[in-house]
């Protein structure tokens, strides 16, 4: 017999030898290992997970200096040391050291924050680590898959991702999806004794298995070593690249203009030109942008996890912010998934069988441990759960699977006779019992009555097994009865749906139940009853009445879909995406995985299977719809912070490049590159706090609108550049400030002008963040305390430098407190128009400005054709009155809504009001009575008037 070391070195072929030999080679039994044996073996085989590549901390740190934005700064450093050494002056060591310091500071912050975010993410993902049922010390328990070692006995069931390579023990064949490993699209049937591979998904069946390989020794582990993961460039990275390219191009344009004007035209000295180019390079590059955005997402991701939504993919946050359609499972998300049975409504179809016996048969066909919601409800209806197995001996249990849609128990009674009971979908049980047409019609009519009251149906059948073997087909099945299942809506679902509607998120119900049940649930939740059976839209037998309307339009307008199969979910998502919607999809089962993958945001609900979690982008740890809507709001707040910063970054690039370019070219004033470095360092320190800023989430779905970011940045940055140019002109060429405020003139002192321009640029540049972070007036929306404190500290430092600094190398001299006060006043006065520009850009980009100017002709007034019709009507009225005629009824005097966009907005508002009104009705006495009457099936006339 070989040792465990031989097993580790794979000198023994455990895949092919008989199963009994496997136990001998692994020195284990069908009773599993002890905890001590497991700990000893993990020292030999290592943990059951793939080895993570250890990354050098130094290389990771230096990696933050290796991106296009950093390259520009590094080019500036090379210019400062290599090119800036002409005209008898030494190399620009101060700027070189300053640039290196800026790069190191930025990389250090990035490194620390990403490290913290990585640790937080690792802690969160540990909660999502695959779990498995393992037999240790003779007891079954759920453990992390990482503790598995060869020799462990594990339980595999529907929806599980197989945790290690294993050989199947006795039981029914298993259907396994190996597409992730082998590319086979169809599930493979695995029989007892055969091997199943780590990473494949159980599609059908339940069985025990003995682990033969773990971690890097598995088939999956070996393949992972051979294949390097491909890095897909996400949408977020593309946006980051686009903004970075815009800033770099803006700087390049400014530099080309400076080179053309300064050298051939103005005949400036070589060194002066280099210094001016350095100003544009250092001041224009938003070096902190990758750090700020990644830190903002990491902190936001942590905040989402605290609300019960763990993000597996960081960029899912931006997609969540833009989500406008949410396809939500009914069971467990909109409802409690706590089923109850009204015994009075149970229907019996077998002579000599009581209603209590129907319930007992249903409980017998249920699991007594490791239950799903239906099993728990059936066993819970018994006075004592032990009754489900009292007086019988279990021979074989057939677990639920999506194909058969039923469970079954083969058992031996006290007399030694063999029987089988089954519960499941009525259609499947009717087919199983080969029911007559009359019986089928009767059953289906009762199912419809249940459905009208919002009740699901569960059928029960029984048979005798005279052959007394578990494989035998048995005697004909007998249809025993029908049970009504009530799954009450969550108490917060109706309110959450109303909130979602107000946030611009259309919630569509996805249910496998009948259409009538879906409509009744939709009515109770106030989400509308415009629902379709998915087979009528997407199946092979499509509804002829709907054939004239495009399927995409029907799906887009629907409030929900009933009778949904997993493949329909995928098609629903696909059709909605074709209509340019950002779609979220919830799911919990193995068959939901394709739809979760296809959706822009796949959401695995609480208690989802491993397969669903693996396919999703966000995993919920709390049940219900409210956690999703809270996550939407939080995602929008996170996205708002990122968008605010990108507008700010573009604005600063424009204001620095074109402000200093104009001053350098018009007045040949050479601003100090070192002072621009000081501005950049103080700005970066302040702007890091934006990741924790207080913001108002967008009231509608939001997304990266590069046109808006660039337009806003150019206008705000351009305005600030002009204000700096005007300030410089007033201080350098006029005595306006001296005459108005009584400060001494600095018009002929370039060093003091340097201090004045530095302070003005520093204040107004950093204050711009308060404009870009707010949707309304910037002084109305209170910023976060950290941002405010950072701004005040940075500007106090900037003011002290401007007042007292006397640095010859930076060509700056203190201007005194009088000038500092004047500059602060000038900055405050020029700050206020920034909000107006922001509103104007938003209005122009919305399309309404051009529409009102050219089509509706209502710009600057709400009257069509600029009030032409009203003026004509008034003139006509005056003329008729003048001639003694009766005034004619004025037609079309009042303004019309001539825009399709406005009409659609009005329709949307009306729809919203109708939904809220319907919701409010449910909370009135009338709505409550009608709901109870319908639920109980009472045959009474509900009064038409109520007095409350």
From Swiss-Prot:
Positions of modified residues (N-acetylserine): 2
Transmembrane segments: 62-81, 94-114, 244-264, 274-291, 644-665, 671-693, 710-730, 752-772, 785-805, 814-834
Tissue and organ distribution: Higher levels in roots than in shoots. Expressed in epidermal and root cortex cells, in phloem, xylem and root hairs. Detected in cotyledons, leaves, hypocotyls, roots and root hairs. Expressed in guard cells and mesophyll cells.
InterPro entries named among the record's database cross-references: ATPase_P-typ_cation-transptr_N, ATPase_P-typ_cyto_dom_N, ATPase_P-typ_P_site, ATPase_P-typ_TM_dom_sf, ATPase_P-typ_transduc_dom_A_sf, HAD-like_sf, HAD_sf, P-type_ATPase_IIIA
Effect of residue 881 to D: No effect on 14-3-3 protein binding, but increased activity
Chain residues that bind Mg(2+): 588, 592
Phosphothreonine modified-residue sites: 881, 947
Regulation: Regulated by an auto-inhibitory C-terminal domain that can be displaced by phosphorylation of Thr-947 and the subsequent binding of 14-3-3 proteins. Negatively regulated by PKS5. PKS5 phosphorylates Ser-931, inhibiting interaction with the activating 14-3-3 protein. Positively regulated by PSY1R. PSY1R phosphorylates Thr-881, situated in the auto-inhibitory region I of the C-terminal domain, causing pump activation. Negatively regulated by the secreted peptide RALF. After specific binding to FERONIA, RALF causes phosphorylation at Ser-899, mediating the inhibition of proton transport.
Pfam families: Cation_ATPase_N, E1-E2_ATPase, Hydrolase
Catalytic activity: ATP + H2O + H(+)(in) = ADP + phosphate + 2 H(+)(out)
Effect of mutating residue 684 to A/V/R: No effect on ATP affinity, but loss of proton transport
Cell compartment(s), UniProt: Cell membrane
Broad class of enzyme this protein falls into: translocase
Phosphoserine modified-residue sites: 899, 931
Outcome recorded upon mutating residue 655 to K: No effect on ATP affinity and proton transport
Domain of life: Eukaryota
Single GO cellular component term: membrane
GO molecular function: ATP binding; ATP hydrolysis activity; magnesium ion binding; P-type proton-exporting transporter activity
DNA damage in keyword set: no
Note: The catalytic mechanism involves at least four different enzyme conformational states named E1, E1P, E2P, and E2, with the E1P-E2P transition accompanying the transfer of ion across the membrane. E1P and E2P are phosphorylated intermediates.
Record comment regarding domains: The C-terminus contains a R-domain composed of 2 autoinhibitory regions (863-885 and 904-919).
Function noted in UniProt: The plasma membrane H(+) ATPase of plants and fungi generates a proton gradient that drives the active transport of nutrients by H(+)-symport. The resulting external acidification and/or internal alkinization may mediate growth responses. Involved in maintaining the membrane potential and delta-pH, together forming the plasma membrane protonmotive force (PMF) required for root and hypocotyl elongation and root tropism. Important for root growth and development during different nitrogen regimes.
Record NCBIfam families: ATPase-IIIA_H, ATPase_P-type
Name of the protein described by the UniProt record: ATPase 2, plasma membrane-type
């Amino acid at each position: 017999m070989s040792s465990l070391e031989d097993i580790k070195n794979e000198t023994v072929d455990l895949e092919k030898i008989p199963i009994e030999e496997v136990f001998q080679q692994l020195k284990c039994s069908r009773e599993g290992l002890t905890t001590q044996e497991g700990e000893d073996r993990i020292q030999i085989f290592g943990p059951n997970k793939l080895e993570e590549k250890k990354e050098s901390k130094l290389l990771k740190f230096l990696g933050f200096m290796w991106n296009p934005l950093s390259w520009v700064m590094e080019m500036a450093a090379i210019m400062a040391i290599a090119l800036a050494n002409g005209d008898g002056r030494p190399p620009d060591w101060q700027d070189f050291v300053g640039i290196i310091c800026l790069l190191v500071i930025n990389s250090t912050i990035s490194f620390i924050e990403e490290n913290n975010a990585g640790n937080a993410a690792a802690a969160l993902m540990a909660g999502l680590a695959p779990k498995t049922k393992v037999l240790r010390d003779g007891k079954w328990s759920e453990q992390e898959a990482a503790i598995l070692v060869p020799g462990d006995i594990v339980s595999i069931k529907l929806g599980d991702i197989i945790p290690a390579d294993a050989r199947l023990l006795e039981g029914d064949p298993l259907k396994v999806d190996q597409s992730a490993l082998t590319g086979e699209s169809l599930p493979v049937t695995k029989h007892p004794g055969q091997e199943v591979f780590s990473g494949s998904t159980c599609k059908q069946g339940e069985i025990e298995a003995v682990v033969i390989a773990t971690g890097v020794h598995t088939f999956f582990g070996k393949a992972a070593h051979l294949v390097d993961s491909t890095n897909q460039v996400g949408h977020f990275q593309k946006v980051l690249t686009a903004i970075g390219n815009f800033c770099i191009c803006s700087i390049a344009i400014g530099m080309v203009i400076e080179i053309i004007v300064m050298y051939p035209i103005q005949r400036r000295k070589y060194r002066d030109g280099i210094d001016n180019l350095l100003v544009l390079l250092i001041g224009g590059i938003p070096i902190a942008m990758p750090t700020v955005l990644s830190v903002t997402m990491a902190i936001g991701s942590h905040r989402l996890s605290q609300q019960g939504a763990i993000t597996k993919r960081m960029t899912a946050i931006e997609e969540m912010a833009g989500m406008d359609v949410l396809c939500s499972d009914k069971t467990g998300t909109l409802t409690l998934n706590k089923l109850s049975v009204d015994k009075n409504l149970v229907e019996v179809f077998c002579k000599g069988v009581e209603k209590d016996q129907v319930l007992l048969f249903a409980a017998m066909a249920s699991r007594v441990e490791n239950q799903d919601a239906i099993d728990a409800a059936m066993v819970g209806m018994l006075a004592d759960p032990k009754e489900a197995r009292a007086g019988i001996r279990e021979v074989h249990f057939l677990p639920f699977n999506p194909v058969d849609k039923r469970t079954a128990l083969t058992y031996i009674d006290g007399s030694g006779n063999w029987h089988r009971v089954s519960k499941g979908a009525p259609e499947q049980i009717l087919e199983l019992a080969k029911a007559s047409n009359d019986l089928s019609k009767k059953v289906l009519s009762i199912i419809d009555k249940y459905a009208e009251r919002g009740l699901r149906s569960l059928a029960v059948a029984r048979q005798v097994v005279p052959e007394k073997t578990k494989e035998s087909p048995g005697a004909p099945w007998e249809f025993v009865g029908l049970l009504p299942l009530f799954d009450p809506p969550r108490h917060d679902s109706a309110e959450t749906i109303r909130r979602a509607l107000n946030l611009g998120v259309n919630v569509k119900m996805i249910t496998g139940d009948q259409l009538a049940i879906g409509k009744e649930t939709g009515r109770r939740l106030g989400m509308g009853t415009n629902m379709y059976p998915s087979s009528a839209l997407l199946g092979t037998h499509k509804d002829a009445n709907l054939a004239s309307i495009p399927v995409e339009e029907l799906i887009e307008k629907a409030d929900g879909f009933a009778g949904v199969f997993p493949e329909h979910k995928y098609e629903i998502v696909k059709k909605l995406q074709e209509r340019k919607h950002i779609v979220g999809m919830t799911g919990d089962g193995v068959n939901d995985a394709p739809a979760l993958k296809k959706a822009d945001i796949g959401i695995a609900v609480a208690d989802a299977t491993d397969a669903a979690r693996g396919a999703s982008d966000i995993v919920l740890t709390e049940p219900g719809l409210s956690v999703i809507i809270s996550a939407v709001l939080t995602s929008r707040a996170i996205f708002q912070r990122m968008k605010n910063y990108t507008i700010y970054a573009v604005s600063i690039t424009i204001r620095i490049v074109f402000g200093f370019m104009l001053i350098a070219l018009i007045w040949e004033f050479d601003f100090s590159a070192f002072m621009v470095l000081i501005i950049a360092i103080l700005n970066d320190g302040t702007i890091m706090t934006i990741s924790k800023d207080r913001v108002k989430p967008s009231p509608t779905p939001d997304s990266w609108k590069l046109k808006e970011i660039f337009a806003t940045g150019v206008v705000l940055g351009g305005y600030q550049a002009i204000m700096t140019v005007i300030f410089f002109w007033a201080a350098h060429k006029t005595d306006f400030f001296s005459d108005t405020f009584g400060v001494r003139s600095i018009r002929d002192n370039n060093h003091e002008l340097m201090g004045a321009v530095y302070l003005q640029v520093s204040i107004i540049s950093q204050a711009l963040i308060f404009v870009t972070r707010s949707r309304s007036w910037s002084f109305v929306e209170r910023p976060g305390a950290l941002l405010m404190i950072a701004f005040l500290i940075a500007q106090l430092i900037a003011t002290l430098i401007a007042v007292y600094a006397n640095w010859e190398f930076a060509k700056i001299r203190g201007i005194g407190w009088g000038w500092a006060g004047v500059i602060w006043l000038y900055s405050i006065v020029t700050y206020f128009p920034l909000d107006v520009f922001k509103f104007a850009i938003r209005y122009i980009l919305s399309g309404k400005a051009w529409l009102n100017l050219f089509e509706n002709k209502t710009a600057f007034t709400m009257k069509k054709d600029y009030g032409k019709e009203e003026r004509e009507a008034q003139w006509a009225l005056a003329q008729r009155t003048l001639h003694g005629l009766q005034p004619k009824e004025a037609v079309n005097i009042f303004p019309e809504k001539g825009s399709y966009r406005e009409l659609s907005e009005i329709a949307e508002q009306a729809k919203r009001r109708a939904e809220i009104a319907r919701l409010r009705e449910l909370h009135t006495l009338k709505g409550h009575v009608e709901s109870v009457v319908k639920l109980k099936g009472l045959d009474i006339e509900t009064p038409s008037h109520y007095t409350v």
